[in-house]
A protein has these predicted regions:
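N-terminal Rossmann-like NAD(P) cofactor-binding subdomain of oxidoreductases
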Residues: 1-194, 230-231, 264, 281, ...
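C-terminal active-site/capping subdomain that shapes the small-molecule cofactor and substrate pocket
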Residues: 230-341
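A short glycine-/small-residue-rich loop at the edge of a beta-strand within enzyme catalytic domains
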Residues: 11, 185, 189, 205-212, ...
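Glycine-rich beta-alpha junction loops
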Residues: 40-42, 132-133, 157-164, 198-205, ...
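Generic solvent-exposed, charged/amphipathic alpha-helical segments
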Residues: 21, 218-222, 263, 267
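Oxyanion-binding "anion nests"
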Residues: 195-242
Length: 341
């Protein structure tokens, strides 16, 4: 019998936590015991995985020495407090928050891009999961980066409200219903009404005028590609879509590559579906294609008419699946295959 593992899911009742448990089930991850963890308020509720019912336990009193793998998806403050405790008990932590991403001794991993970095988990027994917008962009750019190099990335993101949690989904649906029925809307999660709107502001503003979400894409891209000279210029926008982030990506390559050659590279790459027909509907969208699917979709591949070595791409993925939960499970799969077996 193949080895099975005891796994803790911190934030098990949140949007990402619920999807994590679903993906562990779908991919038949070798679970011995599953420990869904949440706040005391959620303790006692049940989740189902692999044909069994598992009771949600109180994170505050949980003994992490009982598990080999702990997945954290409950916010940076929770990870800051509990992840080092879990790691000190021999549990390998895979953290879905931003808390550890910039730590030099913590590997920041996208399995299709830099799986070799997982080996460095032994530094602190912690592996960081990148930001959702970074993950899909780098999955799409890795084959091109390896083939011809990239000097600069310009990207505008169009990000779904589920990236802000369940409360944001509720706010969007309530605002939409109210507006369609001629009622006033309440604004709590976002700085302005999100229904029928676009908000060019995700996370806090920095001194340089960029938001922290935008700077995450800069820092994380350079760390994952191990290339401090790679220039990244992002604009992050929240739009009234429930699931699926979209990105308009423009790159300047070191060597010229045609759209056709780029398309061939992407078609052969793991985790990518190229949907690039130059006709009505011949492109991927967040709701129709990406939602509830694991792939990163790449469309609108074309050479930049304003730059000799420029290339444009439209990149779409489910932000809760590939942007968080799936990427985490893929890391765990490599971890048990190559390091914990």
């Amino acid at each position: 019998m193949s080895k099975k593992y005891d796994v803790a899911i911190v934030g098990a009742t949140g949007a990402v936590g619920e999807t994590l448990i679903s993906i562990l089930d779908q991919r038949n991850f070798p679970i011995n015991n599953l420990y869904p963890l949440a706040s005391k308020r959620s303790a006692g509720s049940k989740v189902r995985c692999q044909g069994k019912s598992w009771t949600v336990e109180d994170l505050d009193t949980f003994d992490f020495s009982k598990v080999q793998i702990g997945v954290f998806s409950a916010g940076s403050d929770i990870s800051e407090k509990y992840a080092p405790v879990a790691a000190s008990k021999g549990c390998v932590v895979i953290d879905n928050t931003s808390h550890f991403r910039r730590d030099e001794d913590i590997p920041l991993v996208i399995p299709e891009v830099n799986p070799h970095a997982i080996a460095n988990y032994t530094n602190r027994n912690i592996i960081a999961n990148p930001n959702c917008s970074t993950i899909q962009m780098l999955v799409a750019l890795k084959p091109i980066y390896d083939a011809v190099g990239i000097d600069r990335i310009n990207v505008a993101t169009y990000q779904a409200v589920s990236g802000s949690g369940k409360e944001a989904i509720t706010e969007l649906t309530n605002q939409t219903a109210n507006l369609l029925n001629g009622k006033d809307v309440e604004v709590e999660v976002y700085t302005k009404q999100i229904a029928f709107n676009a908000i060019p502001h995700i996370d806090t503003f920095q001194e340089n005028g960029y938001t922290r979400e935008e700077m995450k894409m800069v820092w994380e891209t350079q760390k994952i590609f191990e290339d401090e000279n790679l220039l990244v210029n992002p604009t992050a926008v929240r739009i009234p879509v429930v699931y699926g982030h979209s990105e308009a990506v423009h790159i300047e390559t070191k060597e010229k590559i045609s759209a056709n050659d780029a398309r061939k590279l992407l078609e052969k790459a793991d985790g990518i579906i190229v949907m690039d027909e130059r006709s009505d509907g011949g492109y991927a969208t967040p709701f129709i294609e990406a939602t509830n699917n694991d792939a990163t979709y790449v469309s609108r591949i074309r050479e930049d008419i304003s730059h000799e070595k420029g290339l444009n791409l439209w990149v779409v993925a489910d932000n809760i699946r590939k942007g968080a939960a799936l990427n985490t499970v893929q890391i765990a799969e490599i971890l048990i295959r190559d390091y914990l077996a």
